[in-house]
UniProtKB/Swiss-Prot annotation:
Site (Stabilizes the phosphate intermediate): residue numbering on this chain: 74
InterPro entries assigned to the protein according to its UniProt record, in alphabetical order: Gpn, Gpn3, P-loop_NTPase
Disulfides per UniProt: none
Motif annotated as Gly-Pro-Asn (GPN)-loop, chain positions: 72-74
UniProt function note: Small GTPase required for proper localization of RNA polymerase II (RNAPII). May act at an RNAP assembly step prior to nuclear import.
Record-linked CDD domains: GPN3
Residues annotated as binding GTP: 13-18, 174-177
Family named by the database record: Belongs to the GPN-loop GTPase family.
UniProt keywords, alphabetically: GTP-binding, Hydrolase, Nucleotide-binding
Protein name: GPN-loop GTPase 3
Organism this protein belongs to: Xenopus laevis (African clawed frog)
Pfam families listed in its UniProt record: ATP_bind_1
Amino acid sequence: MPRYAQLVMGPAGSGKSTYCSTMVQHCETLNRSVQVVNLDPAAEHFDYPVLADIRELIEVDDVMEDRSLRFGPNGGLVYCMEYFANNFDWLESCLGHTEDDYILFDCPGQIELYTHLPVMKYLVEQLQQWEFRVCGVFLVDSQFMVESFKFLSGVLAALSAMVSLEIPQCNIMTKMDLLSKKAKKEIEKFLDPDMYSMIEDTPSRFKSTKFKKLTEALCGLVDDYSMVRFLPFDRSDEECMNIVLQHIDFAIQYGEDLEFKEPRENEEDKSENFDEYFQDRTDES
């Protein structure tokens, strides 16, 4: 039986921990068992129980206080993640070997972990060796994405993670419940965007022809290949959360290997009568 994992990624403040907490509660209402692993060594607080916490292995504060290392916040976090990559046996012992696991990995927000460093790629490969089907879940703050150029910046961040990790990925706009009605209408065009028309709407923002050509080339890459699309995530809307979960489940083929109960005898009789009915209709025609 395969195991399933979501790598919950995104910039700092995009709502990764809130997403994990909300998704755990939502899955509980669906009678689905979901666990969370915290992979952020700089995390201070989260309101959900964790299966494993990287801070039990190493913490950013301890690294920064080590005078022999002399790391700042970013350097300390990179050091922690590289140390983690050299100690995957700790994670394996925390996860155990239970079949049909469904685990959310709450990841750090530093984008260089996905674009410049191989740490997260190593994690994906290790999880796949442990028979996990892995889906990336990249979050961006919807309040940040209401302008065309900011939206393009978020698209490129999501695309860089997608290209680097080489796994199925769902891109999500979070905090939709915090938007005003006017902002919600404005942001609808960014969920399934026409990149070219977005650039045409802001011609006065281009300060040089080179910048315009670069922007048009990036928009063409995203638009022509339909590489990045976003799903809205409103934690107050059960249907919205269902849609997000269904997209992720489809990406990792969740449920295809679940064992189903055998039909009872009366159900078998009904199915036989159902087949006979259609056979009779075929004979008549």
